């Protein structure tokens, strides 16, 4: 990546610590609001509706009730252009342009504000793509489609950049995340399922070569006095495997099924759960969302509300003792939302469990006769997230290039507001980083 290497040589750069949980939703919303996930009321891609066991919803732009940087800039009369920042559907009304994100429903046409811009955007990109089906065995197709998607995104970015002299321009590109999920085991010899496949390794390398080229083409349009910053909301690492949270809860007597064990890969919602004998159940993903079956809250609750804290502590102790197939401790770390966040709004899980510093995914499906899986239970996946993302500030004002101090993702929003001379709302929890830009 020669262009990025050249930029790095005149940048301040370092690690950007993500949030709990280190997931795209809520991390980008935290970054640009300066407010933690609990206060925002967003804890991941899926949230359980109150009063149900399995009814779920995906957060949208309207879920975020706190203003983000572009909202405050818009109120101040600044012109903004935002591309793909999640959650971004439906596109919020801003003083400028907002193009929706990868969570946009298939077939949606209302993905850009103002709507009058859509025909031009479609023409420039030959159809604006939002994401690629990346958890699939056909890696060659995945690689080709990711390269094409990212090229179209950058074509849109060049088109939008050239429309007017924006005060603030932000572009989110989901492609690198997808490349990691689909191809990590082909370029990392330390991956537990490493495959020496030159063609697939080459696809990953081709993606990054293309990305470097596209970054260069976009920045060639940017005047030298414009501040350029690269940010990521989380890092990536090899996926070690999956821990079957519901299989474990069954083994401990906290979750009870009726009848014989279900076939492998059975979702919990399709299993015969005996809720009258169940104290807790879990959901899969980058971390385990654990819910308690509480009387008066769940339809068939078994735990008294006064028992919840003690039961959570018991589960935490039991999870801490879990060992991997190699005999080593799994490294389960349990977080209770009310102890982690300033506030707990929205529909939070009762417990959040990370496994092996999030190197192990949580599998919510059943029927394996084992607590561990080598592969993801919802489709092929080579990588998971990590807490350390990156920042890179090109040509920092103070001239201090090279490695910089570790920073916190939640501090980016107030730092940008300070840079623009805007007051920082009193409920913002992050702090401006000085110097940074």
Range-by-range predicted roles:
Residues 1, 17, 45-76, 91-96, ...:
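Secreted, luminal/periplasmic, and some membrane-associated catalytic domains
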Residues 143-164, 168-169, 179, 185-230, ...:
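A long, amphipathic alpha-helix that forms part
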Residues 21-22, 36-38, 80, 86-90, ...:
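Short, solvent-exposed loop/turn segments at secondary-structure junctions
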Residues 2, 26, 64-71, 151, ...:
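A structural signal for well-ordered alpha-helical segments within the folded catalytic domains
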Residues 1-167, 174-181, 290, 431-436:
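Active-site-proximal alpha/beta segments of enzymes that process anionic O-linked groups
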Residues 355-413:
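Low-complexity, glycine/alanine/valine/leucine- and proline-rich hydrophobic stretches
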């Amino acid at each position: 990546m020669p262009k990025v290497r050249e930029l790095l040589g005149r940048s301040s750069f370092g690690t950007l610590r993500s949030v709990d949980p280190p997931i795209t939703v809520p991390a980008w919303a935290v970054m640009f609001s300066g407010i933690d996930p609990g206060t925002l009321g967003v804890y991941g891609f899926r949230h359980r509706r109150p009063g149900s066991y399995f009814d779920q919803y995906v957060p949208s732009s309207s879920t975020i009730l706190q203003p983000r940087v572009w909202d405050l800039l818009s109120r101040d009369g600044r012109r903004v252009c935002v591309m793909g920042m999640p959650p971004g559907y439906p596109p919020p009304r801003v003083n400028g342009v907002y193009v929706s994100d990868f969570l946009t429903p298939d077939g949606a046409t209302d993905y850009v504000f103002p709507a009058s811009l859509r025909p031009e955007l479609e023409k420039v990109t030959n159809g604006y793509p939002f994401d690629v089906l990346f958890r699939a065995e056909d890696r060659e197709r995945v690689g080709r489609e990711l390269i094409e998607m990212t090229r179209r995104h950058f074509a849109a970015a060049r088109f939008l950049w050239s429309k007017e002299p924006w005060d603030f321009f932000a572009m989110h590109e989901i492609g690198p995340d997808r490349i990691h999920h689909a191809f990590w085991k082909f370029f990392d010899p330390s991956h537990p399922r490493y495959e020496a496949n030159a063609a697939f390794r080459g696809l990953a390398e081709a993606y990054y070569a293309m990305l470097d080229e596209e970054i260069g083409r976009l920045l060639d349009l940017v005047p030298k006095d414009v501040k350029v910053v690269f940010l990521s909301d989380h890092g990536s690492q090899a996926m070690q495997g999956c821990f079957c949270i519901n299989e474990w809860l069954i083994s401990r007597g906290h979750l009870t099924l009726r009848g014989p064990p279900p076939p492998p890969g059975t979702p919990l919602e399709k299993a015969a759960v005996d809720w009258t004998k169940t104290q807790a159940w879990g959901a899969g993903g980058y971390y385990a969302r654990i819910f308690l079956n509480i009387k008066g809250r769940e339809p068939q609750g078994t735990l008294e509300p006064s028992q919840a804290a003690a039961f959570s502590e018991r589960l935490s102790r039991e999870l801490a003792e879990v060992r991997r197939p190699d005999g080593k401790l799994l490294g389960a770390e349990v977080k209770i939302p009310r102890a982690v966040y300033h506030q707990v709004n929205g529909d939070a899980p009762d417990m959040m469990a990370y496994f092996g510093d999030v190197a192990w995914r949580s599998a919510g499906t059943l029927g394996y006769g084992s607590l561990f899986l080598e592969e993801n239970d919802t489709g092929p996946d080579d990588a998971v997230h990590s807490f350390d993302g990156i920042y890179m500030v090109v040509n920092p004002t103070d001239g201090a290039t090279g490695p910089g101090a570790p920073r916190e993702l939640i501090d980016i929003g107030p730092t940008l507001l300070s840079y623009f001379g805007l007051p920082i709302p009193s409920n913002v929890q992050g702090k401006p980083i000085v110097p940074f830009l």
